[in-house]
UniProtKB/Swiss-Prot annotation:
The gene is ENY2. Belongs to the ENY2 family. GO terms for cellular component: DUBm complex; nuclear pore; nucleoplasm; SAGA complex; transcription export complex 2. It comes from the Eukaryota. Component of a deubiquitination module (DUB module) that specifically deubiquinates monoubiquinated histone H2B (H2Bub). Does not seem to be a component of the TREX-2 complex. Seems to act independently of the SAGA multiprotein complex. The DUB module is responsible for the major H2Bub deubiquitinase activity in Arabidopsis. It comes from Arabidopsis thaliana. Component of a deubiquitination module (DUB module) formed by ENY2, SGF11, and UBP22 in Arabidopsis. Interacts directly with SGF11, but not with UBP22. Interacts with MOS4. PANTHER family: ENHANCER OF YELLOW 2 TRANSCRIPTION FACTOR. GO terms for molecular function: transcription coactivator activity. It is found in: Nucleus, Nucleoplasm. This is Transcription and mRNA export factor ENY2. Keywords: Activator, Chromatin regulator, mRNA transport, Nucleus, Protein transport, Transcription, Transcription regulation, Translocation, Transport, Ubl conjugation pathway. Pfam families: EnY2 (PF10163). The keyword Nucleotidyltransferase does not apply.
Length: 115
């Protein structure tokens, strides 16, 4: 920044470029806002929760958490550690059918919302 006694600092070119990048709204953000505003995001969250329970994924994650706690000792495990250890396994084990159904619903929403 260039400073002056008589006027506020003039931003450098790099600062201006960074400002433009911060102002850009991504397509992902637009879709997320529309999903929230319409209430469809909550519907999708409920759909995913139901499908993960139906396929046994939730039970698998509960078992994985319990095994990790048992292995490390109840007093030596924090919630943050449990999340750090279990999250990659959980994400990798979401069935493709659940991912496909969610993607299909999002695509249909985008088409119907004319985004």
């Amino acid at each position: 920044m260039k400073h002056s006694v008589n006027r506020p600092p003039t931003p450098d070119e790099d600062d201006v470029a960074d400002g433009f990048e911060k102002d850009k709204v991504t397509l992902r953000e637009i879709i997320n806002v529309k999903l929230v505003e319409s209430g469809e995001k909550e519907n999708l969250m409920e759909l995913v929760r139901d499908r993960l329970v139906e396929c046994g994924w939730k039970d698998e994650m509960r078992i994985a958490c319990r095994e990790h706690v048992k292995k490390k000792g109840r007093k030596d495990v924090t919630v943050d550690e449990l999340i750090r250890v279990i999250t990659p396994k959980g994400r990798a084990s979401v069935p493709d059918s659940v991912k496909a159904e969610l993607l299909n619903r999002i695509q249909n929403f985008i088409v119907s919302a004319a985004l």
